[in-house]
């Protein structure tokens, strides 16, 4: 397996598991917080998708995120440049749209990511994202994306377990060690 296949398989795996884990959640499950200032599944799902959207825009040197070009910001009742990702408490108040909208954005970003990665070659992984920051390469950006996605997916799994002690990873999405 080469590096591009590994990156692609990692992103597909986390996407399939994420969509399968979130499919069918109720509004209460999306909005439930283990503690008053903790994140809920809806926010984490939005954050993961928004982050992936931004990282793929950077890596591909695209002009704008799907958040703007496809008008997803409107479905979240936001402006193109909001919400401010540095405003942690403001983000907690981000109004969550329906699960369908959340998953729709997630799927659209995944499809864009897959299309981009299918056209990347190994040499491009070592290319800097910008000339003034040589150490930040396309490969580093994609590695960070995979780590970020898996970390936050673990949070969603944990919250699902708190919500329902009989919940387990969807069949076929867990790790099988032989």
Each language-model region and where it sits:
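Residues within well-ordered alpha-helical secondary structure of globular protein domains
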Residues: 24, 47-50, 108
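N-terminal export signals and maturation junctions of secreted/periplasmic proteins
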Residues: 1-5
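A structural signal for long alpha-helical coiled-coils and helix-turn connectors
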Residues: 22, 26, 118-121, 160
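Acidic/histidine-rich alpha-helical segments that form the ligand environment
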Residues: 78-125, 141-145
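Short, contiguous alpha-helical
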Residues: 8-12, 16-19, 29-85, 128-178
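A general secondary-structure boundary signal
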Residues: 24-25, 110, 149-150
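Hydrophobic alpha-helical core bundles mediating ligand binding, dimerization, or RNAP-core interactions
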Residues: 11, 15, 22, 106, ...
